[in-house]
Every structure is written in structure tokens, then in C-alpha cells.
Curated annotation (Swiss-Prot):
The gene is rimK1. Coiled coil: none annotated. HAMAP family: RimK. It comes from Shewanella sp. (strain ANA-3). Its EC number is 6.3.2.-. This is Probable alpha-L-glutamate ligase 1. GO terms for molecular function: ATP binding; metal ion binding; ribosomal S6-glutamic acid ligase activity. Keywords: ATP-binding, Ligase, Magnesium, Manganese, Metal-binding, Nucleotide-binding, Protein biosynthesis.
């Protein structure tokens, strides 16, 4: 097969590991900078051009769309889909997961556990908003934030009101969430491919920081997840419509709670922490899906 890896960063560990996994299974891997693609949108033969040439012959793509280029990245993935190319994560699912509010609403619709979350537009909603999620301490998040950036823990009601007022005054979109104290600055990252959790690790934030993101100096360790956590991780990915995703879970007194579903999860941290390859299962899944599509086309023909 010819597999395109949509990534702005060919030198990244994640990109290099995906290339290696494709090549080790006998496939051709081509790294494509998403932002350098340009599209011919028509009703007869939609196409994508790159570096002066039309991209042809691809069986599948693995989107690694950075959050900052979600709009254009999804457009490129959508164009590949229009060309009949299988996408490991499709454009609609990526867009769903990147909209944090929409993602939580989808999880809520499916009855999947999560921290109590509030969202508001007007400053005069603040007191009731804080009470709605259980009062202080509480977590305030920018909807556009990634990797723990734009996340604030407000220890008191006064601090919470001040932070919320400041964000709303800047016309920033925020949500507030109950603080799960018993998680103690840690979460569980589950790496899901299809309907399986292929690897999982516990992430612990630096001392004094409630955020567990490895990019912020947190550390990871291999962890055995419970059947309930495994079931919830797979259900969350399915609710988004994704195939490959990282699911962040908090362990609370009322059971596991979904914090986030990431459509382009980091690979380096979980592979180096667990010693498990997460890229091989991705390529194996693509092989299975592309083969099934070809078989279906043959039957129809």
C-alpha cells in the first residue's frame, strides 16, 4: 500500500515511528506537510496537489493534524476522502474531538462519565456557574488550549470569579469543571486503536502542579487499567467516531471520568514509558480496513 502521513513535522518521533511501522510491513510511506497541500475542488475529479505535482495512488492516510491548523487540516483530510482514500481518522471525527465543548456534549449524550462541566457567555452568570460545578476549587479551561496550556486551578470562589471575569473580558471561550481532588494531579492516558486499548500509562504532574501533561514536565509510568476504564476509553473514541485516539481518564471516587479525547495523541511518551509499539497496530488496522474496502468494491463490481 501507499500510505500518506499528514504531518508538518517529519523529524518528530511520532512521524518517524509511523514511517518505520509502514515500511516494516512492506508499505510505501510518504510524509506530507498538510499546510503545503492545495486542492482542486470540482464535481468530476477532485484532487490534491503538493510541491507542484498531483498526489495520486494513495490507499490510506494517517492524519497527524496539529491543533493550530485544524480547519485547514480537516479540509485536506476531507479532500482525500472525496478522492476515495481511507483516512485512519476522518475529517468529521477530528473536528468533533477538537471542539472541546462539542466533544463533552457527545460524551454526555452517550452517558459516559466526565467531570461536571459548565459553559457560559455572560459575566453575570459567574456565581451560578461556579455553584453549578460544585464550587471552588475548580478548573478553568480555554477551549482552544492544548497540552495543559490555558488551564487554571482556582482554589477559592474569589479567585475563580476573578479568572473567569478576566477570560470573558478578553472574549475568550472558556469552560469550568469540577476539580477531582482525589486524582492528585495524575491521569491515565489510554492509546486506542479501533476497539482496543493497545497501551496505557499513568501521568503524574510535577510537584505542586495539578496538570499531568508530559509536555509540562510531568512523568509517566506503565499502569494496568481496570475493565471499566478500558470499556470507557473505547466508548469515548467510538462516540467521537475516531479510530486512533488518546483518551485521558481521571480516577475519581465515583469511578473513571473522561477528561479529553485526543485525535493526534503523542506517541513518544507512551511508547518509551510502556515499551509497547502503538504504531504497528495503527498500520495493521489500516491494512484490515483497506482490504475490506477493496473486497466490497470487488463484490459490487
Amino acid at each position: 500500500m501507499k500510505i500518506g502521513i499528514l504531518s508538518q513535522f517529519p523529524e518528530l518521533y511520532s512521524t518517524r515511528r509511523l514511517v518505520a511501522a509502514c515500511e516494516s510491513r512492506g508499505h510505501e510511506a510518504v510524509v506530507i506537510n498538510t499546510l503545503n497541500c492545495y486542492m482542486n475542488i470540482n464535481s468530476i475529479k477532485p484532487s490534491i496537489h503538493y510541491q507542484g505535482q498531483e498526489l495520486t495512488g494513495f490507499d490510506a492516510i494517517i492524519p497527524r493534524i496539529h491543533a493550530s491548523v485544524t480547519f485547514y487540516g480537516c479540509a485536506v483530510v476531507r479532500q482525500f476522502e472525496m478522492m476515495g482514500v481511507f483516512a485512519a481518522n476522518d475529517s468529521i471525527s477530528i473536528a468533533r474531538s477538537r471542539d472541546k465543548l462539542r466533544a463533552l456534549q457527545l460524551l454526555s449524550r452517550k452517558g459516559i462519565g466526565m467531570p461536571i462541566t459548565g459553559f457560559a457567555n455572560k459575566p453575570n452568570d459567574i456565581p451560578d456557574l461556579i455553584n453549578m460545578v460544585g464550587g471552588a476549587p475548580l478548573v478553568i479551561k480555554l477551549l482552544e488550549g492544548t497540552q495543559g496550556i490555558g488551564v487554571v486551578l482556582a482554589e477559592t470562589k474569589t479567585a475563580a470569579e476573578s479568572v473567569i471575569e478576566a477570560f470573558l473580558g478578553l472574549k475568550a471561550n472558556i469552560m469550568v469543571q469540577e476539580y477531582i481532588k482525589e486524582s492528585n494531579g495524575s491521569d491515565i492516558r489510554c492509546f486506542v486503536v479501533g476497539d482496543k486499548v493497545v497501551a496505557s500509562m499513568k501521568r503524574q504532574g510535577p510537584e505542586g502542579d495539578f496538570r499531568s501533561n508530559l509536555h509540562l514536565g510531568g512523568c509517566g509510568e506503565k499502569v494496568k487499567i481496570t475493565p471499566a476504564e478500558r470499556k470507557m476509553a473505547v466508548a469515548a473514541v467510538k462516540a467521537m467516531g475516531l479510530v486512533v485516539a488518546g483518551v485521558d481518564i481521571l480516577r475519581s471516587n465515583r469511578g473513571p471520568l473522561i477528561l479529553e479525547v485526543n485525535s493526534a495523541p503523542g506517541i513518544e511518551g507512551i511508547e518509551q514509558t510502556t515499551g509497547i509499539s502503538v504504531t504497528e497496530p495503527i498500520v495493521e488496522y489500516i491494512e484490515k480496513m483497506v482490504s475490506a474496502r477493496k473486497s466490497n468494491r470487488a463484490v459490487i463490481a
